[in-house]
């Protein structure tokens, strides 16, 4: 049987030190980096996403950073398409794709594929846009909530692109997006039980985080404070100056940006904004840990250890990812 090419996943919660370890790995391995982060795809959103500096990116390029305008949406399906293309290009040049980031849904989409959603239907889309113009997007959101409350809970009424797509899927197929995803989950579970994967690579799964959760909480608070000192509020002011950006867009709903936006709207004091931003980031980290606890064949590394690079290399050698 032909051996599949290698790939490395470097996962972990926010503020755990993933980027630093990824760069150390690229210094000693023939790897190229692919970002797995739903916020880093956006241009002009640098401080609040803790995006690597321009100097660092020039020295250690990351695919899938700064590829979209904040007015655009980016789905797990979009990521899967882009990441597979990047992985194929890296592999074709004899290198190893090293995927680093904390958007766990993206990793899952790569490994398991995505629900087979119906193609876009221009006529249905035109009907939905006409209804929105006549009734308002809130009315369409109410329609979605009536048939697919799970999707409605995830999609903001001011996110017309995702709202239109969810209703389009239901009207075209007769099944909600939630039903499609549940069917895909059942297929993925069956594939996992039989050892099949939708990703044509031999994947080494690494995760890094402080063993002490309080240490991570301290890091999160320190980083959010540092972002504010670096000009995070001014960054959001610049985004707000654009007439095509609003609080319902996926980019602006990113952790931190949402809280600063509300502060600039007068909904939160400066202290409340900072507190809620830190809490939201901690909640994100908790969700990331929840994903990781169920991840198979995962090698954990402690962020505070000084020997993570040799430990990671030893693990990669043990599973023959480097042979």
From Swiss-Prot:
Catalysed conversion reaction: adenosine(37) in tRNA + dimethylallyl diphosphate = N(6)-dimethylallyladenosine(37) in tRNA + diphosphate
Coiled coil: none
UniProt: substrate binding residues: 14-19
GO biological process: tRNA modification
Top EC group: transferase
Family label: Belongs to the IPP transferase family.
Protein's UniProt name: tRNA dimethylallyltransferase
Species this protein is from: Pseudomonas fluorescens (strain ATCC BAA-477 / NRRL B-23932 / Pf-5)
Organism placement in taxonomy: Bacteria, Pseudomonadati, Pseudomonadota, Gammaproteobacteria, Pseudomonadales
Gene: miaA
